[in-house]
Amino acid sequence: FWGALIKGAAKLIPSVVGLFKKKQ
């Protein structure tokens, strides 16, 4: 369970950071 959660977060975080940088 935790392995899948970490892999999902690893994929999600870069996209969230990209969206945050676009807003600025």
Curated annotation (Swiss-Prot):
Tissue expression as described in the entry? Expressed by the venom gland.
Q: What are the boundaries of the signal sequence?
A: none
Using the UniProt record, give the first listed, main subcellular location.
secreted
Q: Kindly list the GO CC terms recorded for this protein.
A: extracellular region; membrane; other organism cell membrane
**Tree of life domain:** Eukaryota
Q: Which Pfam families does the entry link to?
A: Antimicrobial_4
Q: Which GO terms describe its molecular function?
A: toxin activity
What's this protein's function?
Answer: Has a broad spectrum of activity against both Gram-positive and Gram-negative bacteria and S.cerevisiae. Has insecticidal and hemolytic activities. May act by disrupting the integrity of the bacterial cell membrane.
Q: Which family does it belong to?
A: Belongs to the non-disulfide-bridged peptide (NDBP) superfamily. Medium-length antimicrobial peptide (group 3) family. Ponericin-W subfamily.
Protein name as catalogued: M-poneritoxin-Ng1e
